[in-house]
Every structure is written in C-alpha cells, then in structure tokens.
A protein has these predicted regions:
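Alpha-helical transmembrane segments in inner-membrane proteins
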Residues: 1-254
Length: 254
C-alpha cells in the first residue's frame, strides 16, 4: 500500500487551486477583458457566438497548453535530476533542447512551414540527440558526469550547425525560425496542438508508471539491481520519456 503524506496532499491541492486561478485569469485577460462570470458562461455556451469563440477557440487552447507544457517540462526536469544527481543534468545544458531546435530548422528548410512536420521534427531531433549523447557516453555502462560533459559538447556542435542552417536559409524562413525559437503561445489553436499534446499526455502517463523504478534508482545502482531493476535499460527508458516530453513541449511553444 502506497503511503501518501498529508503534506503532499496539501501541496497538490494548493498547486491545483493555483492552476485553476491562473487558468481563469488567462481566460479573462486579453485585448478584451472579460468578467469571471462571462468566462464561465462562455464555457457553457450561454454567451454570444463572438464571445464564446474568443474564450473557447482562442484563449482556452493557450491556457490548457500552457499548463500541459509546464507539466511536461517539470516532469522532464525531475526525471533528469533524479537520473543525473547533478544541477547540470538538465535538457537545455545537455543539448536536447538544441537538438529539438535542429530538427525544427531542418524541417523548415526542407519542408517549409508545415506544422505537423515541424512538431515531429522537433521530437525526432531531441530523441536522436539524446541517443547520440548516450552512445558517445557509453563505456560498459553510463557515468552521469561523462554523460553531462558529452552532452555539453554535442550541444556546442548543434549550436554551430543551427547557425549554419540559419545562414543558408531564406530570409523569410530565418525570420520565422527566429520567432519560433523565441517561444510563444500566441496563435496556438486546437488544430495546432496535434500531435504534440497527445504525445505529452502519453509520456506523462509513462512517467507515472516509471516512478517506482526512478525511486529505486535513487537508492543506488546496486540496490536497484538487487531489487530486480534493469539499471541501464530503465535509465535509457526514463531519459527517452524525459526527452520526448521536452521535445514535444518545444514543438508546441518553441
């Protein structure tokens, strides 16, 4: 039986309340400020069509995706910190975000502005980068310090590659890529949430299923192995989940 502390329950409730309050504020705010009662009426469909569209088609996707992206990045960071046990063990420092950005640039240069291609390319770029770092760091097992150092080196090479792609791209593509790289939820609609949002939800479920392995790995490799955990396979699986979460979030918001 899993014991859940009162402190954890209270913390989760407070975070849930904060998310609801932030969501309502996000639905109210914009070029046209709405009252809270108007927001709830629009969600129920009891307002004029124009107001309902503003709330449900424009603001609601951005609010929900902001919460989903925050959850993805938070869980991804927690997984990396658990695996690396080092403040430098984060997706941005190790180059996985940069790998996703490389995938986006390649998609923009080769496939134009197709949103589905860009989203998939971001995830492929992040996954390929993580596998490359993992393979380069493998020496009869993975040492986290070596993994971080190699990740920093791969990130530096990808930054140079991305700069070269931007220099070779057309002016329009370079400007679009620069705006995308800045990161924004502006213009995000329901149609643009696929395939990234479903993938994030699936990876969050996968992360929840891997919590037991993660806790055992935190006790040390020998202890985890004695308790029946395949250490290297579990590490690779958790890292892939964390990378996909980061890449999918990057595909949504830049």
């Amino acid at each position: 039986m899993i014991y859940v502390s009162r402190r954890l329950i209270i913390t989760c409730l407070l975070l849930l309340i904060a998310c609801v309050m932030a969501g309502v504020w996000g639905l109210r705010s914009g070029a046209v400020t709405l009252e809270t009662s108007q927001v709830f009426a629009a969600l129920m469909g009891d307002t004029p069509r124009s107001m309902t569209m503003v709330v449900t088609e424009w603001r609601l996707p951005r609010v929900l995706m902001a919460l989903l992206i925050g959850a993805a990045l938070g869980v991804s960071g927690a997984i990396f910190q658990s695996l690396m046990r080092n403040p430098l063990g984060s997706p941005d420092v190790m180059g996985f975000n940069t790998g996703a950005w490389s995938g986006v640039l390649v998609a923009m240069v080769l496939f134009g502005q197709d949103l589905t291609a860009i989203a998939l390319a971001a995830m492929v770029g992040g996954i390929v980068t993580s596998l490359l770092v993992w393979l380069l760091a493998w020496r009869n097992g993975i040492d986290t310090f070596r993994l971080i150092i190699i990740g920093i080196g791969v990130r530096a090479m990808l930054v140079a590659f991305n700069t070269w792609l931007l220099l070779k791209a057309s002016l329009e593509t370079a400007l679009t890529a620069g705006l995308w790289n800045a990161g924004s939820l502006n213009g995000l609609t329901w149609a643009k949430t696929s395939p990234s949002a479903p993938i994030i939800i699936l990876m969050l479920i996968a992360a929840a299923l891997l919590v037991r392995r993660m806790r055992l790995l935190e006790m040390g490799d020998d202890t985890a192995c004695a308790l029946g955990v395949s250490v290297e396979r579990s590490r690779l699986l958790m890292m892939l989940v964390a990378v996909v979460l980061t890449a999918a979030a990057t595909a949504l918001a830049g």
